[in-house]
UniProtKB/Swiss-Prot annotation:
Region annotated NRD, chain positions: 8-247
Identification of the protein by name: Global nitrogen regulator NrpRII
Subunit structure: Forms a complex with NrpRI and the general archaeal transcription factors TBP and TFB. Interacts directly with NrpRI, TBP and TFB.
Keywords: Transcription, Transcription regulation
A Pfam family reported for this protein in Swiss-Prot or TrEMBL: NRD1_2
Family of the protein in this entry: Belongs to the NrpR family.
Regulation: Under nitrogen limitation, binding of 2-oxoglutarate to the NrpRI/NrpRII complex decreases the binding affinity of NrpRI to DNA as well as the binding affinity of NrpRII to TBP and TFB, which leads to removal of the complex from the operator, RNA polymerase recruitment and initiation of transcription.
Function, as annotated: Involved in nitrogen regulation. Under nitrogen sufficiency, represses the transcription of the nifH and the glnk1 promoters, via formation of a complex with the global nitrogen regulator NrpRI. Does not bind DNA directly.
Length: 252
């Protein structure tokens, strides 16, 4: 499908490309990670950073690391316009890139909204598969206003953004070892690792595979939106060196 030189790229293809280009090593805390990038009004920066800190400290993000790009500064081929500030989080697909580099043929399957009840993940209530859309599912679902991440923070029950990937069950030991390394590196967003040949949060898993659910890196952005602060988010925006990221507590 091509028109006027433009070729449609489904999200699954973009994910595979970013996974192969991810070089982050959790043991060395170095390499390139995938960044979710949002634009906000400069006047809202302090409020947004406060919200990000609240969400991240509650464990509803992939890592405690963020990137702030001031007006006039550039990130890749993008320059932040006057009156705006860029703010980025680590995308959960970075985890898939790390697993892939470890020789585990992981397959990101879908993004969706997970219902949480009293702090326990119950089920996916809305999902979009990566092969069926040209826009990141979490970006779409966030724009629909169907999350209630802020309510989850207040009451322990609500709807948060998350995504699901499958991996061969024979690689379970290697998966757990690599997830442990990521946990040591501050990647706290692993929501659930399912049993082989078992549905995960009510989603069926391919035979001889297991499912892994990870919190979406755009949950902090979803809370900003829920608070009525204008924010324009581009999930899986680009690759960036992990060394350019800062811990949220160093910024607030």
């Amino acid at each position: 499908m091509q028109k006027n030189g433009y070729r449609i790229q489904f999200t699954s293809s973009r994910i595979r490309d970013l996974m192969y280009r991810t070089t982050f090593d959790p043991k060395k805390m170095d390499g390139d990670i995938i960044l979710n990038l949002s634009l906000i009004d400069k006047k809202d920066l302090d409020d947004v950073l406060g919200i990000f800190k609240m969400v991240i400290s509650s464990g509803l993000s992939v890592t405690p690391y963020v990137k702030v790009i001031s007006e006039g500064e550039s990130i890749g081929d993008m320059t932040i316009e006057k009156g705006k500030v860029g703010i980025g989080t680590v995308c959960s697909i970075t985890i898939d890139g790390v697993l892939l580099k470890a020789g585990i043929p992981v397959n990101p399957k879908l993004g969706g909204v997970v219902q949480i009840r009293n702090g326990i993940p119950v089920r996916f209530t809305d999902v979009l598969t990566y092969v069926s859309t040209t826009v990141d599912p979490l970006e779409i679902l966030m724009s629909q206003g169907i999350t209630s991440v802020s309510e989850m923070l207040r009451t322990g029950s609500g709807k948060v953004l998350a995504n699901l990937r499958e991996a061969p069950m024979v690689a379970r030991d290697e998966i757990e070892s690599n997830l442990s390394d990521l946990l040591d590196a501050g990647f706290s967003g692993i929501l659930e690792v399912g049993e082989p040949n078992t549905r995960v949060l009510d989603v069926p898993i391919e035979r001889d595979h297991l499912g892994i659910v990870v919190i979406g890196g755009t949950n902090p952005m979803a809370v900003v939106q829920e608070y009525g602060i204008p924010i324009d988010t581009s999930a899986m925006s680009r690759l960036i060196s992990f060394k350019e990221m800062s811990r949220i507590e160093d910024l607030v």
